[in-house]
UniProtKB/Swiss-Prot annotation:
Source organism of the structure: Synechocystis sp. (strain ATCC 27184 / PCC 6803 / Kazusa)
Name listed for the protein in its UniProt record: 6-carboxy-5,6,7,8-tetrahydropterin synthase
Alphabetic keyword roster: Lyase, Metal-binding, Queuosine biosynthesis, Zinc
Annotated active site: 23, 72, 112
Main function: Catalyzes the conversion of 7,8-dihydroneopterin triphosphate (H2NTP) to 6-carboxy-5,6,7,8-tetrahydropterin (CPH4) and acetaldehyde.
Gene name linked to the record: queD
Co-factor remark: Binds 1 zinc ion per subunit.
Gene3D superfamilies: 6-pyruvoyl tetrahydropterin synthase/QueD
Classification via PANTHER family: 6-PYRUVOYL TETRAHYDROBIOPTERIN SYNTHASE, PYRUVOYL TETRAHYDROBIOPTERIN SYNTHASE
Single GO term (MF): metal ion binding
Lineage: Bacteria, Bacillati, Cyanobacteriota, Cyanophyceae, Synechococcales
């Protein structure tokens, strides 16, 4: 089994209306993330020979999501989520990439700080722990 990932980053603001701490207030993060794609075999023909997927293909799916919904947005509005936690953002990105037909989509990880992250896994796959 092979797993590749593509990293991304975005600056955004959000607030968690149900949170009892400081995250209830409007605040921002320098978010980072990774999209993981898995395959039990490598491509054997064409320009992707020897690859799970060309990273540029994954980037082509990911970049519009970042540009049009995440980077420098107020996530409560742009994602249509009442409480855009890192968990919810990871699931939202996963759903959009799945809708776009990204083959082998395994998981999406979103880091809101360098020490705090959430990772959403495909229900079809077992998490790698």
């Amino acid at each position: 089994m092979w797993i590749i990932y593509k990293e991304f980053s975005f600056e955004a603001a959000h607030q968690l209306p149900h949170h009892e701490g400081k995250c209830r207030r409007l605040h921002g993060h320098s978010f980072r993330g990774r999209v993981y794609v898995a395959s039990d075999r490598l491509k054997t023909t064409g320009s992707e020979t020897g690859m799970v997927m060309d990273f540029s293909v994954l980037k082509a799916h990911l970049d519009p999501l970042v540009k049009n919904h995440l980077d420098h947005y107020y996530l409560n509005d742009s994602l249509g989520l009442e409480s855009p936690t890192s968990e919810a953002i990871a699931a939202w990105i996963f759903a959009k990439l799945e809708e776009a037909g990204v083959p082998g989509l395994h998981s999406v990880e979103v880091l809101e700080t360098c020490t705090s992250a959430a990772r959403y896994f495909s229900p079809r796959l077992s998490p790698l722990l």
